[in-house]
Amino acid sequence: GELESQIQDIDRKKLECSEKQEFEEAASLRDEAHTLRESLQAKRRAWEEEVRSEVVEVTEDDIAEVISSVTGVPMQRLAASEGERLLAMEGELRRAVVGQEVAVETVSKAIRRSRAGLQDPKQPIGSFFFLGATGVGKTYLAAKLAEFLFGDEEALITVDMSEYMEKFAVSRLIGAPPGYVGFDEGGQLTERVRRRPYSVILLDEMEKAHPDVFNILLQILDEGRLTDSTGRKVDFRNTVLIMTSNVGSREVGSGGVLGFQNSDEDAYQAQIEGKINDAMKKTFNPEFINRIDDTVVFKSLTRENITEIIEIVLDEFKKRLVDRDIALRITPGAKSMLAEKGFDQTYGARYLKRTVQKLLEDPLAEEILQGNFTDGSRIRVTKKGEALVFDEERDSVDLEEEKKPETAG
């Protein structure tokens, strides 16, 4: 520490004085170093006595945390009052996933069924087919489900099936055969599940996968395990298998379905689901669809949904600024403009995120780089014409919660 550094400096000066034959100065430095060494030893003895008298208690939670970090098994979650959490599952997921009540309810029921012991123990916790247009929350629901079940969004294993369109690529899921390149690396699916047996597996864009991929998935759905190229059996029984597809959504498009107006929402949605389900049955084999726990058609997002999603997107953006101690207060007028310009039924929430990036993040980044705002700034974002403007907010206002509604601008 600091005393040790001082002693080293004094010893160095003492040596220099000795070389210059300044013996009186050297003797004085020697005495000073001796005093500091005695002080250092006294502090060290006091610290050792304090450590010896203090008993460190290791609790069950500490042991559970260590086991979780080593094995990837979420011990803390398993030890919690699981029943209460599962009964409140819909409410927690709905706060994050907007406008997809049917999807959230379907997934929640299947998870509860499995955790209650009513599911076949040989099969995964749940298997789902998520269908619908782009940007409606299919991948996002999978990520939030991983966070809810296993306490971490990192428990989501994503496999892009566009990488497995060719027959020769299919073997990479379970590992290359002996003698082939990549044999020592293990399977891109099996190895990740072996290292993290409690996880949500997301197979994205299933319609692009080679037909041989479905033979592998049939074994997972039937037996809950796979044998990789090295002969190891990989357990899938503690995973949730989610497959996504945009099949049928392009045909439906954004122009409605013949015979129904968009205002007749229930009939319109039922007709869309029928079209997408028909397209799914033409694309995937019956023996595969028959083994899936449930198929969910995600609804297209409405303007009201976008208004709710903008709050989630902006909250995530504010969290990214916490490290720099920068706080934003975005006025209702600014939020309304972002929601209005970010609404596109064809592209869903992804278009909203691009709008926020273009109208909010890019201009704010330029302001920060120009030195107009620094760490610790309190920034108010308001609407001015067709753009957002930023100014320093010096008043003692609550930057996280807008207590009073403001007029646009």
Where are these regions (language model features)?
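AAA+ P-loop NTPase nucleotide-binding core of proteostasis motors
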Residues: G1-G409
